[in-house]
Amino acid sequence: IRDRIRAALIFASADTHNFLKNESKVTLATSVELIHTYSLIHDDLPAMDNDDFRRGKKSNHIVFGEADAILAGDALQALAYEIIADDNNLSDESKIRAIKLLSNACGKNGMVLGQHLDIKSESKDISQMEIEHIHSLKTGKLIECAVMLGQLENISSNEKIFKSFGRNIGLAFQII
């Protein structure tokens, strides 16, 4: 269930209204998976979580070195935005909205902040509420983003409902 759940949520969310072409669903799903993969590569680095293995395989920085791991993560992040910009099926307004949703989920209000708080909390006694906040930022924001990306061209009164749904799925994902 953990693999490609974000991509599946984009398709499921988009299929509620059928405004997005399949090619754009693939573009958006790919962009989210690129961001997710970049975050895992960076998360494993010695300066972060210092993990030598990811899903039973040697981490990127163990196989290729720290410098190349950082560059690989950076390249994946840039590619995520590039493929959205290159999608000719999306309007310019939708492209901007998609890039804003994605950058908010992975930037200073999302994964980056969550990673920062996680690093700062190491070797400290933190509350369950603080742990949940960190996880909601590190993982939940990108899941919420996936649901919202599926609704990219469906600006409606249901936006709050889909955002709440995405947030709740993100919280549930932490339990699994």
Where are these regions (language model features)?
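Mg2+-dependent prenyl diphosphate-binding active-site environment of isoprenoid biosynthetic enzymes
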Residues: 1-176
